[in-house]
Amino acid sequence: MTDAAFPHRHLLGIQGLAPSEITSLLDLAEGYVEQNRSSDKRKNLLRGRTVINLFYENSTRTRTSFELAGKRLGADVINMQSAGSSVQKGETLIDTAMTLNAMHLDVLVVRHPDSGAVKLLSEKVNCAVINGGDGSHEHPTQALLDALTIRRRKGKLSGLNVAICGDVRHSRVARSNIYLLNAMGAHVRLIGPRTLLPSGLDRMGVEVFHDMRKGLADVDVIMMLRIQNERMSGNFIPSIREYFHFFGLDREKLGIAKPDAVIMHPGPMNRGVEIDSDVADDVERSLIRSQVEMGVAVRMACLDMLTRDLTRSEGAV
């Protein structure tokens, strides 16, 4: 495993990370993949340290994998959700952060529905903070696990054509992946109806397609995104049936991509909406289960890096 230092106090986003820093995290995660596949999954690297997962939104994959990551590194892990906490009694995010800070924890993993909330919280605590997803802003560990998944299958990130398809407008996963893939030299395409693509894409270094068949031509990786109804106010698509017809991934559309193109999805999937079960469960080309596996290793790497007793810069990314 790498001994490289991570020069940031927090991991709040991918934007601003240097390619070398991304590579260091991925290289470290590689070692944890092999550890997790062994009979002895536990390593007491974080023995005596405390990790709190503070989630203001529901989560299965992210929260569970952070819990596993912390426990496999020997940390004391506490899961907190807004339901059943003082948040329901009117406590503010900052008050909650300062309360937890007084308990001398080492790492705080936060998911929050408001973009920028995690950065605000990070300015009020002494511990390391990891962004577990904030609104439509960023989800850095998802982008890192996606990158590791791609790199293990394709052997590289640079030069690959990656299509991100679906509800990009409301997706923090899409934003973090765009930042990471651009930084690592991949070519990013965004595919979706105009209503589900954000403004300002010309500044993000991506190609935009409103025709999925044209957008999938010659791609190496297809990332499908679900429609995030919980972040919508109003109707963004005419109907589920029509959306699947034009923008759902099925066997016919998959055939337009390269013969060895792989399929990814951050989950949860809406089968029959953005992806057909036939391709989602393709044992040769679907990497969806591999993404889940890589998630634990990547989050172990992030916890490892952020808790090393090394001199860190005061700036946070």
From Swiss-Prot:
Enzyme class name: transferase
The entry's keywords: Pyrimidine biosynthesis, Transferase
GO cellular component: cytosol
Matches recorded under Pfam families: OTCace, OTCace_N
GO BP term, example: 'de novo' pyrimidine nucleobase biosynthetic process
Gene Ontology molecular function: amino acid binding; aspartate carbamoyltransferase activity
Disulfide topology: none
SUPFAM superfamilies the record matches: Aspartate/ornithine carbamoyltransferase
EC number assigned by the record: 2.1.3.2
Catalytic activity: carbamoyl phosphate + L-aspartate = N-carbamoyl-L-aspartate + phosphate + H(+)
Chain sites annotated for binding carbamoyl phosphate: R61, T62, R111, H139, Q142, G267, P268
Binding-site residues for L-aspartate, renumbered to this chain: K89, R172, R226
Pathway named in the protein's UniProt entry: Pyrimidine metabolism; UMP biosynthesis via de novo pathway; (S)-dihydroorotate from bicarbonate: step 2/3
InterPro entries: Asp/Orn_carbamoyltranf_P-bd, Asp/Orn_carbamoylTrfase, Asp/Orn_carbamoylTrfase_sf, Asp_carbamoyltransf, Asp_carbamoyltransf_Asp/Orn-bd
Recorded family membership: Belongs to the aspartate/ornithine carbamoyltransferase superfamily. ATCase family.
Known partners and oligomeric status: Heterododecamer (2C3:3R2) of six catalytic PyrB chains organized as two trimers (C3), and six regulatory PyrI chains organized as three dimers (R2).
Family annotation (NCBIfam families): asp_carb_tr (TIGR00670), PRK00856.1 (NF002032)
Functional summary from the UniProt entry: Catalyzes the condensation of carbamoyl phosphate and aspartate to form carbamoyl aspartate and inorganic phosphate, the committed step in the de novo pyrimidine nucleotide biosynthesis pathway.
Protein name according to UniProt: Aspartate carbamoyltransferase catalytic subunit
Organism of this sequence: Paramagnetospirillum magneticum (strain ATCC 700264 / AMB-1) (Magnetospirillum magneticum)
